[in-house]
Swiss-Prot record:
It comes from Chlamydia muridarum (strain MoPn / Nigg). Residues 1-268 are annotated as: Amidoligase domain. It is an enzyme of class 6 (ligase). Belongs to the CTP synthase family. This is CTP synthase. Pathway: Pyrimidine metabolism; CTP biosynthesis via de novo pathway; CTP from UDP: step 2/2.
């Protein structure tokens, strides 16, 4: 086999941070001069997360080629330079759909279609297709869910078969939780032992055990895990809870020397690892002595911390070149204290979303920011809120609205895109990377320093072309358009320090080492506003 495979599974509890671990391993392996590809296998039966409620699943991350994916792919992007595509993700829904389609097309020659071998073979096909497309030295495969979940069994069986076929080219990392009982002042290894026993009963003996814990594990505890889980002591690693930032994870794993172990098992020669640049970024990010900037996030899914994951991370990245500390203030659009909360902030960000709930609150937030000259950044639905607000209160069209929110509005300044009126919801939006032509002498051009960019999209609605001339004649600047059809991509509000809306999702391109320029300029404007107000 021309590539090496690392399979990452999780046990004991969910939300262990497998995605962050996989992303961190990718960064460390890249620093060793290896080309890395990544694949996330999700056991849920949805074809993709595109129609899933953000309260259940968190945000939907979109790749350049227009695939709606799990938010873990966002971690992969932010930590490493891996190329992500439709080959970087698969769900049980996709796997079963392919198997059933093949059966309907007669490709199984009348055989009884079963989980083994037909479903497992399809999973193996996904792994091989990812490797063939990206041609990596190392392919990291994260298996979603927790060992013991019935949904994961076909994926684990496929992993077992794949490892049997390529024993010298595969490694299994099992990530577990090792609880610390404060009352007894004891670290308990039994849950890890049981999780590994469960995994071994399926036919997979882990090569590495990565123990997530609240406190550092002693050599004695590692020896105990080694003994009862049948792995060498030097294959037991500790991922202690991070103190300040998720971006400390590569530094933690580097201190554990886990990559040296993996490379030696694969027959690679480890190189000296220099993470000085990453350490400097993390140190700056965690520096609390910079001027504090408070950004109000006006969104409807605030109860789920992962619903706006990429937005949160993009703001965090931008705080480094903007040279400020950051506090993100969640503000409900339905709150009666909306304007009072915004008055305490240095900037307002209105993120993407769907549906009528909270819509009027987002428009109210946009109006308050425009009236009070507060920096404001609207993304996707947020941009549409800026346009509707401007139409209502600057153009004196009081009933102006989006057709998504009011199908009977007399002034539909936001309308459905041509060809989007479909009953099928999954995977039918305008998805993926599209070009955007930027007008010189604009806030957007000042940020990008170029007149043509590629940004990722996820939407059905657009600024109504029938109202573009009226909006522009009354001052609204359309400074970014898609050359393919002149779709409005970026708007700027006139006579304002910094008020900008984008139809795309810039948060999907930001990295710690390469913050997105629009977020940097937004935070810089918020910092200037804060300093002018004399805020501490």
């Amino acid at each position: 086999m021309s590539f090496k495979s690392i399979f990452l599974t999780g046990g004991v509890v969910s939300s262990l941070g497998k995605g962050l671990t996989a992303a961190s391993l990718a960064l460390l392996l890249e620093r060793q001069g290896l080309k890395v590809a990544m694949l996330k296998l999700d056991p849920y039966l949805n074809v993709d997360p595109g129609t899933m409620n953000p309260y259940e699943h968190g945000e939907v991350y979109v790749t350049d080629d227009g695939v709606e994916t799990d938010l873990d792919l966002g971690h992969y992007h932010r930590f490493s330079s891996v190329q992500l595509s439709k080959h970087s993700t698969a769900t049980s829904g996709q796997i079963y759909t392919r198997v059933i389609t093949k059966e309907r097309n007669g490709e199984f020659l009348g055989s009884t279609v079963q989980v083994i071998p037909h479903v497992t073979n399809e999973i193996i096909n996904v792994i091989q297709a990812c490797a063939e497309h990206h041609k990596p030295d190392v392919l990291i495969i994260e298996i979603g869910g927790t060992i013991g979940d019935i949904e994961s069994l076909p994926f684990l069986e496929a992993v077992r078969q794949f490892r049997c076929e390529h024993p010298q080219d595969c490694l299994s990392i099992h990530m577990t939780y090792v609880p610390y009982l404060k009352s007894a002042k004891e670290i308990k290894t039994k849950p890890t032992q049981h999780s590994v026993q469960n995994l071994r009963s399926i036919g997979i003996s882990p090569d590495v055990i990565l123990c997530r814990s609240e406190v550092s594990l002693s050599s004695e505890v590692k020896r105990k895990i080694s003994l009862f889980c049948n792995v060498p002591e030097n294959a037991v690693f500790n991922a202690i809870d991070l103190e300040n930032s998720i971006y400390e994870m590569p530094l933690l794993l580097a201190r554990e020397n886990i990559v040296d172990f993996l490379l030696s098992k694969f027959g690679f020669s480890p190189k000296s690892l220099d993470l000085t640049d990453w350490q400097n970024l993390v140190t700056t990010l965690c520096d609390g002595n910079r001027h504090l900037v408070r950004i109000g996030l006006v969104g409807k899914y605030l109860e789920h911390k992962d619903a706006y994951k990429s937005v949160f991370e993009s703001l965090s990245h931008a705080s480094i070149p903007a040279n400020c500390s950051l506090e993100i203030v969640p503000i409900s659009p339905e709150s009666e204290a909306l304007t009072n909360q915004l008055s305490q902030c240095d900037g307002c960000l209105i993120p993407g979303g769907f549906g009528t709930r909270s819509w009027e609150g987002k428009i109210a937030a946009a109006r308050y920011c425009r009236d009070n000259n507060i920096p404001c950044f609207g993304i996707c639905l947020g941009m549409q809120a800026l346009v509707v607000e401007y139409a209502r209160y600057a153009l004196s069209l009081p009933l102006a609205n989006s057709l998504e929110m009011d199908p009977n509005t007399p002034d539909p300044v936001v309308c459905m895109m041509q060809g989007q009126d479909t009953m099928i919801k999954g995977g039918t939006m305008r998805l993926g990377a599209y070009p955007c032509q930027i007008t010189p002498k604009s806030l957007a051009f000042e940020a990008y320093k170029t007149d043509l960019v590629q940004e990722r999209h996820r939407h059905r609605y657009e600024v109504n072309p029938a109202y573009v001339d009226l909006l522009q004649k009354n001052g609204l600047r359309i400074v970014g358009v898609c050359p393919q059809g002149d779709l409005c991509e970026i708007i700027e509000i006139p006579n304002h320090r910094w008020m900008l809306g984008v139809q795309f999702h810039p948060e999907f391109l930001s990295k710690l080492a390469a913050p997105h320029p629009l977020f940097v300029k937004f935070l810089s404007a918020a910092l200037d506003y804060s300093l002018e107000k004399g805020r501490e």
